[in-house]
Amino acid sequence: MAAKIFCLIMLLGLSASAATASIFPQCSQAPIASLLPPYLSPAMSSVCENPILLPYRIQQAIAAGILPLSPLFLQQSSALLQQLPLVHLLAQNIRAQQLQQLVLANLAAYSQQQQFLPFNQLAALNSAAYLQQQQLLPFSQLAAAYPRQFLPFNQLAALNSHAYVQQQQLLPFSQLAAVSPAAFLTQQQLLPFYLHTAPNVGTLLQLQQLLPFDQLALTNPAAFYQQPIIGGALF
């Protein structure tokens, strides 16, 4: 009797466990394979053999697709690094061409600037010498036109620059230089001797102003400068 009761209890327990049991379906390969990207390797066909290996298999497949691209990326990077000096050289050539076009477009101004470059350097180093040189610039042009006649004055400028500047400052007041350069050069050749005769610059200036009115100076400057001067004044 007890054995029958025990068997009945066992049957009731089995029936209750069967009623409450859950059914877990087996993993299907087709749905998971449809979710995978098409560019992965064929090794993904065996991914669903074990669900635990799924992340590892996917990681291996992605790595297998990326690794072949790495050498190509490195080659492109090295090629870009090698082309950087060529890019800099090309930029320098473009700048040089632009400067050359600018110089050709304004060649006259560029040449004039290059001619005045030594004077600009002299002005930066010694402003007094630069101003003195600018005062002598018109006379330098006349000396370039008549170099042989101006040779004594160049020697005077080398020996006594102060006397030479005083002498050249009187040049604009001489009307003879504008009328007859040849006669004026003859007069200038006698001027160093005349400076010893008339040491007063004011008297010499008055004499230069009266020079156009003296007919003897216009016809014969040598004879004019041989005339005596009494008391440092002209009568």
Swiss-Prot record:
- Asked if the Swiss-Prot or TrEMBL record annotates the protein with the keyword Metal-binding, the reply is no
Keyword Repeat among UniProt keywords: yes
Q: Which UniProt keywords apply?
A: Repeat, Seed storage protein, Signal, Storage protein
Any one GO molecular function term: nutrient reservoir activity
Give any Pfam family that matches.
Answer: Zein
Position of the signal peptide: 1-21
The record, for InterPro entries, names: Zein, Zein-alpha
Family that this chain belongs to: Belongs to the zein family.
What function does the entry list? Zeins are major seed storage proteins.
Protein name per Swiss-Prot or TrEMBL: Zein-alpha ZG99
Which source organism? Zea mays (Maize)
